[in-house]
Structures are given as structure tokens and as C-alpha cells.
């Protein structure tokens, strides 16, 4: 009997060994870039999710670039991935959207925003073009000039004056609420004064589960994330159904246009509208609120940066007939030092570890092959940490941007993506951040009370918040 048992153990051992071998050596056409597939089922997910208390490139990426080179293979949450920090390959991939690559998401993102099956926006269709055109019509330069800039300023003023009565508060969380209220208004007509839901808090909770292992069981970050996702989904769905029932009750937001196109575009469904609205809301809130939180961190650590900013914003006010008049588009565009400050914050504070694409066909490059169907993580933040372009790259120094010409900046600074997929909300994000700085620096004093420690896990976050006190200046 023991012989049968021994044979059984041997067979199981052989099968496991074969499985592990196949996992670590996936069958592909051509030669894979060097790398490791990690452990069966989970790959190298745990290494990617490890905490790094620094603004530097996450060690998962940095150490593998040092070991394997700028292109390497890995496996995250069970999905084989090619990671590229090679500038030439990255540029090629951005230019090949719709031909060699398309938009792609990790399982967590797909489940959060329903980006699976017919709802997954891919480059071979015109879904992204549609969403981009609608988003630009709402949040692009023309809308900012004619309407949004003034509304952004009103939103900022209301929140800052409210901050003076709060005592000590978390700037990152408060900023997330501020941006969420603004974005939700223009995306789905959300009225925060009448709603009991805290949109900013829901978005904050999203962040905790986005790159978690997609295990939807109670007690996990991803489970909590999915619960909050359902809350937000319900809010948007209710608004959408109200708008469909009464199309004439429009508010000039994204839902208005989507409802009009509901029966004219084959891919537009109610589920699609809700998914796109949620994705746009998340991207807007997280990028702007993180940047504002980092601004307070850098103000506390490098107070000298305020000298140029204070002088610039005082110059804007002194040229007005009425110092209390609203910020104009020309004034906003004249803020050179402010833009240098914003660039430096965004350079160091890239929220996401990389931009995801999917290979539509085998892609040969430098003797390697990126297999069809594999996910590609395009890491552009290595450019922002290149000491040949940005001297002492981990140092916060907005003045460095005075000497960087436009061509060098375009090639080495891609905070909003590249190719045809550059973020349609880039102008909105910059305008919101700049307007916030204008009102803050011109009219308020502040001090950091506690917090400010950051970490990449691998998304950038504040470990203990960034708590501040704000007071109105005496005129």
C-alpha cells in the first residue's frame, strides 16, 4: 500500500514541477525579455505592493531595470506583463495605438469600472475618441476660458474659507472632496448640498484597493473598494435614470450628452455611461488632490519656493483695476513660476506606476518579442528621474524648469500619458491646481501641523495624511 502512496506523491510532485516550470517559462513565439514570473498564481504581486517610503521610482521597477535592463517580463495578479522603461519603445507603443496595442487594465481596474467585454474601451474602436471628444468639450481649453475657470475659483474660495473654521484638517482629503464635488457636478449633475454621500471619501477608498489582489471576500481591501464602488455606481445610475426619464432636465454635463447619444452610438449603454463617469471622476480627483497635498508638503520642507510664487501672484493682483475681480484666462496663462512649480510637483508626484496597454500582435524589439495578448506597462517616470535631464532628480527644485527647453520637456516629461492617449483632462487638472495656488497664496496663510510622509505601494499616497491650519490674511 505504501508503494501506491509513494507513486501518488511522485506523480503529484511531477505535475506540480511541470506546472511551476510552465508558469516560469511561458510558451511564446520568439524570445521574451529577461525577467521572472514569480510565484504561481500571484506572480510578483507582493513585491509590487511592497511599501516604499520615497518619491523615487518604486524598487520593484528600479531594481529590475538594474538587473534586467529597461525591458523586462513579470507577472502581476496572475497576468503576464512586459514592463518597459525604454524611451524608444515607449514612444513606438504610443504611436502604435489601434494597430499594435490597445488600452488595457489590470483585473482590479476592470472589475472596478466594468471595463470588461463590450464595455472595455479599446483603440481599434472609436469609443475612446467619443469619450475624449465629449470630455474635451466639457473640460477643454474653450470651456475653461468661458466658464470653468470662474467656477473653479468659486469652488476653491468656498473650500478655503471653510477650511479656516475647521482648525486642523487633512489637506489631501479636503482637496479630494473639493475636486470631487466640482467634477461630479459637471459629470453627472451631483449636488453635494442635497446629497448625503461623501464623494471624496468614496474616491479615497478606491485608491486603497485599485492594485490590491482582486480577491472579493470580506476583510480585504478589494472587497471594501468594491462596496464603495457600488455606492458611487448607485448614485450615478439614479441620476442617469432621472435624466433618461426627463431629457429636458439637462444640466449641460456629461450625462446630458451621453443620454442624447444613447440610441445613436452602438457601444453606448447605461452601464457604459456609468463606468466612464466613474473612471473620469476617479482620475480627476486623485491626480489633483494628490498634487495639492504634495504642494503643502513641499511648502513646509522648502519654504524658499514661496518667494517667486508670492511675487508672481502679487504682480497679477497689482495689474488689476479691482484686486477682487475674478482670475482671467490671460492671467492664468501668464503664471510662469506657478507652472514651473506645478511641473516639479507632478514630476516627483506621479500617482501611478505606469500606463497600461495590451499587445494586439507579436511586437519584435531589439531581439525580443512582446507576445500578442500580453499586458504592457509603459513606465515614463524613469524619464523624470533621469539625472542627465533633471540634475539631482530627487531634489525638489522648480527653478530647474527655467533652463529646460520645450522640446526636451516634451520628450522627457509625460505626466499625462503620450501619443493619442494623452489625458483629456490635463488642462483641467493644471488649471484647477494653478487656481488653487493663486487663491491660497494671495489671500491665506497656512502651516503644516503634522503628517506629510509619503509612500509608493506602488501608487503614491500619504501614510499619515498632511494636516494643516489655514487662516485668512488681513487686508
UniProtKB/Swiss-Prot annotation:
It catalyses: beta-amyrin + reduced [NADPH--hemoprotein reductase] + O2 = 16alpha-hydroxy-beta-amyrin + oxidized [NADPH--hemoprotein reductase] + H2O + H(+). The chain crosses the membrane at residues 3-23. It is a single-pass membrane protein. Heme binds at residue 423. Gene3D superfamilies: Cytochrome P450 (1.10.630.10). Pfam families: p450. GO terms for molecular function: heme binding; iron ion binding; monooxygenase activity; oxidoreductase activity, acting on paired donors, with incorporation or reduction of molecular oxygen. GO terms for cellular component: membrane. Its EC number is 1.14.14.171. It is an enzyme of class 1 (oxidoreductase). Its cofactor is heme. One of its GO terms (biological process) is brassinosteroid biosynthetic process. Keywords: Heme, Iron, Membrane, Metal-binding, Monooxygenase, Oxidoreductase, Transmembrane, Transmembrane helix. It is found in: Membrane. The keyword Heme applies. Involved in the biosynthetic pathway of maesasaponins, which are oleanane-type saponins with diverse biological activities. Catalyzes the C-16alpha oxidation of beta-amyrin to form 16alpha-hydroxy-beta-amyrin. Belongs to the cytochrome P450 family. This is Beta-amyrin 16-alpha-hydroxylase CYP87D16. The lineage of its organism: Eukaryota, Viridiplantae, Streptophyta, Embryophyta, Tracheophyta.
